[in-house]
Amino acid sequence: MTGIQALERIAPTKPMQPGQVERREFEYERHGTLSLIANFDVVSGQVVSPSLGPTRTEADFAVHIGRTIDLDPEGVWLFVVDQLNTHQSETLVRLVAERCGLAVELGEKGKSGVLRSMATRAAFLSDPTHRIQFVYLPKHTSWLNQVEMWFGILVRRVLKRGNFPSLEALHARILEFIEYFNKTAKPFRWTYTGRPLVS
């Protein structure tokens, strides 16, 4: 989940010429932001069920997860997420309980039961007996989350040198890139061998 600004350069970019580097205006006009919530399928290397919208609230994340689960309503789902509070929300707990057909008393947020705290909600969401399970990465390990690597690719290939005169242009360009990326997608291959680092 990430926020993306629709930035339009004030002056047009001047392309490279012999003996001259490309010249890009550093001043820009901001046309608003979009929030991208995406899933990265580690087996196929594809971006699955992306959601683009103006906000990234707990309701937005729960709707996104619901749409993703709708791709295979009876399937087993494993979501790797960071420690963000929207990934441990009451709305998400209620969605998982409903979709898994769990008839348990969830309690009241901030007071009792599963909904009492973020820790109790995270424990419920990460229960391996549920067919929809969340795995929470430890803090400061975003490099383990493969969707974060994909966000880096999106920044380098689309956003860094992009010029977006409107939110609609940004929205369309991101979806075009995802479609293009998925056509040639391959899973990321880890190259670190696991040897201890030496100083």
Question: Where is each model-derived feature located?
Answer:
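Short secondary-structure boundary/capping segments
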Residues: 11-14, 93-97
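RNase H-like polynucleotidyl transferase catalytic core
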Residues: 23-28, 99-146, 163-164
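Short catalytic/ligand-binding loop motif for oxyanion handling, primarily in non-cytosolic enzymes
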Residues: 5-7, 86-90, 143-146, 197-199
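Acidic/histidine-rich, metal-coordinating catalytic segments
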Residues: 75-87, 110-112
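A generic secondary-structure signal
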Residues: 67-71
